[in-house]
Amino acid sequence: MFRKPDGIILPNSGYKNLVVYKKSDVLYQGTVVFCQRFLPPYGDRTVDQMTQAARSCKQNIVEGSSVAATSLETQIKLTNVARASLAELLEDYLDYLKAHGDMEWSIDDTRKNNARDFARSHADWNDWKPVFISCPAETFCNLMIVLIQQCRYLLDRILAWQEQNFKENGGIRERMHTARAENRCENWDKILYSMLELATTPADLESRLATLCEFARRSAESIKNRKGWKR
């Protein structure tokens, strides 16, 4: 269960602490290197499509983290955009493999299992750069596919958490409404108490209490009539 926030603005831990951001940065940097090594420098729209998709994933994670404190709804939308960008990037790498007669590593392939293990424990670009500047295109594509799959898994988990958080805490509008309502209730309690506190005798106290009860009864009837509620 998520703890109800004490204030209207939710805490924000920062995107640079997220493993999914670090992996998305590797995806972006790696895609730039891939395009430089294996795609024509001019006249190929695939270069723009791939780099834009990789950048979109990374930037939407950054923007989603930036708005997390004030708008959970917007954060969820941005996380979905980041995930969709990953799907586009994955398709581009799969298309490259097909176009060049290469294959995606199967789930039982030792190379894929080794790549998964390496990717789980290495989320920094400096760990991947030496590999990407020297490996052949087929290996490059399959490594990127593994990274995309892990990044997508992390985004799915984050998205599930964000949606649950939104259900329990609401957006900023809901939190502001709750804060105003709680403030009104607190002020109303003080007003009622002060009215009763002014009583000079037990009989006066009972009279004041009866007056307040009658006011509450009439107010309730007025609300029922206004809302069209039947008795």
PLM region spans:
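Amphipathic alpha-helical assembly/interaction segments
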Residues: 1-231
